[in-house]
Curated annotation (Swiss-Prot):
This is tRNA uridine(34) hydroxylase. CDD domains: RHOD_YceA. Belongs to the TrhO family. HAMAP family: TrhO. It is an enzyme of class 1 (oxidoreductase). It comes from Corynebacterium urealyticum (strain ATCC 43042 / DSM 7109). Keywords: Oxidoreductase, tRNA processing.
Length: 297
């Protein structure tokens, strides 16, 4: 079949995950590495006994080939791929690794999966079902951010609860702290960038007594594609590539503020201290000043 000029000229980023039992993660890792190298893709792929989690970029043609060939593995047959603007240049290299977890909550033994995905996770809601739940249950609905607190500085669902966590490893301690016990009998909508973190987080929450837990199909990305900035989402979405953030429309609110001068901004920069490199929100003027640091180092 002939390849169109558009497929060769245009580039894309693919985001995907699939929870399914994998008997030999190392074999899958070697196959995925060879496949990506043959197609000229860059990005990051994690594989464990629980499944696969990846973000890759390259030509539109290469991405289409990658999605088709990855779905040939029986466990990945129904895997959904999210397409985004960008390409191989958005990632410094290709990294394909085997890990204990494809999302590092520090609880590999607690997570259970079968061919249908995570066992005991939160109920999946499509974006329109999220809005319907809020229409029906009103302020009783709690949006619970399943990302690092830093990510929520530039975008979040309206009135969301944002846990004080720096990494996903902090969530279990945070959930068990008692701070969120008031939510245990409320409808809780967990959310994250593409949905994968909430597959695990919602199961961890249910295991700890949260009675009515939901998760958004496709995460913030899918909700934003559906409603742009006319729904319940506000601000920019933090992303883990060179773009750093993305917006769903030109009407996106600017929720972040420069840590140095207070000006509105949605862009993170690395601290100028080479031994720190903490990511901090800075406006362009302050980011250009080598004297400005994160204030913690």
């Amino acid at each position: 079949m002939a390849v169109s000029a558009t497929d060769l000229k245009e580039s894309r980023i693919l985001l995907y995950y699939c929870f399914t039992p994998i008997a030999d993660p190392t074999a899958i890792m070697l196959w995925q590495k060879q496949l990506c190298e043959s197609l000229g893709l860059t990005g990051r792929i994690l594989i464990s006994e629980h499944g696969i989690n990846g973000t890759v970029g390259g030509s539109l043609h290469a991405c289409k080939q990658y999605a088709r060939r990855t779905r040939e593995y029986p466990g990945f047959k129904g895997m959904e791929f999210k397409w985004s603007q960008g390409g191989a240049e958005d990632f410094p290299r290709l990294s394909v690794k085997v890990r204990d977890e494809i999302v590092s909550f520090g609880a590999p033994g607690e997570l259970k999966v079968d061919e249908n995905g995570v066992i005991g996770g939160g109920t999946h809601l499509k974006p329109e079902e999220v809005n319907k739940l809020v229409e029906e249950r009103g302020d009783d609905v709690v949006f619970f951010d399943g990302r690092n607190a830093m990510e929520a500085e530039i975008g979040r669902f309206k009135n969301a609860v944002v846990p004080d966590v720096e990494t996903t490893h902090d969530f279990i301690k945070e959930l068990e702290s008692g701070k969120y016990d008031w939510m245990k009998d409320k409808p809780v909508v967990s959310y994250c960038t593409g949905g994968i973190r909430c597959e695990v987080l919602s199961a961890l929450m249910k295991n700890r007594g949260f009675e009515e837990v939901y998760q958004i199909d496709g995460g913030i990305v899918r909700y934003g594609e559906k409603y742009g900035d006319k729904g319940l989402w506000e601000g920019s979405l933090y992303v883990f590539d060179k773009r750093m953030h993305m917006e769903f429309s030109e009407e996106a609110k600017q929720l972040g503020f420069c840590k140095n001068c207070g000006a509105a901004t949605n862009t993170f920069h690395n601290c100028e201290n080479s031994e720190c490199r903490e990511q901090i929100l800075l406006c362009e003027d302050c980011a250009a000043d080598p004297a400005v640091t994160c204030g913690e180092c």
